[in-house]
Design a protein with these regions (language model features):
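Short pre-catalytic strand/loop immediately N-terminal to key active-site residues, enriched for Gly-Thr
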Residues: 43-49
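Short, conserved micro-motifs enriched in small and acidic residues
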Residues: 18, 51-56, 76, 163
Length: 166
């Protein structure tokens, strides 16, 4: 067995194509990893929580694979690779903000340009403010790709309003 993947399933396969975990499979394919590997993935959040857990996994997986190959990687590179993997390898209809935020970590002001480039400026909040930040899981589940698809389909309908905002 060349690849062992432990998540809600236990996989022991010989080729990347046999891997069922979509994120692991996509990252291994993207970075052309052909040596055997074992991945253990345990998450506290259920899938489709809307809290960026998929992008967190993709960024973390890519980072781990780069480290295993002794390849230095920047936060910017991790973000761009995660976007590429999720949008063009996994073919998910997702945005870019989750991947950027996960790659950079912390609290940030992110400006995303129309051409896909971005700037990420870390924010150092007052400690009192930090003590009062709360992340809330609502228990609702949704597919980010469905939401993104709906937003894109509504773009033409709402383009006048969007242009005024931008």
């Amino acid at each position: 067995t060349k690849y062992r993947i432990f998540w809600s399933h236990m996989e022991a396969v010989n080729t990347i194509e046999e891997i069922q975990h979509p994120g692991v499979k996509a990252c291994l394919n993207y970075l052309k990893i052909d040596k055997g590997i074992e991945v253990n993935h345990a998450g506290d959040l259920p899938a489709r929580s809307g809290l960026g857990s998929s992008s967190s996994f993709t960024v973390g997986m890519l980072h781990a694979l780069h480290v295993l190959q002794d390849q230095p990687v920047t936060k910017h590179q991790l973000a761009m690779e995660a976007i590429e993997v999720e949008q063009n390898v996994m073919l998910e209809n997702v945005g870019v903000q989750d991947q950027i935020q996960c790659a950079w970590g912390g609290l940030n002001h992110i400006v995303i340009d129309r051409d896909g480039s971005y700037t990420c400026n870390p924010i150092t909040p007052d400690p009192l403010f930090e003590q009062h930040l709360v992340l809330v899981y609502t228990g609702k589940q949704r597919f980010a790709s469905d939401i993104a698809k709906e937003q894109v389909s509504n773009f033409d309908k709402n383009s006048t309003i969007i242009e005024k905002i931008v």
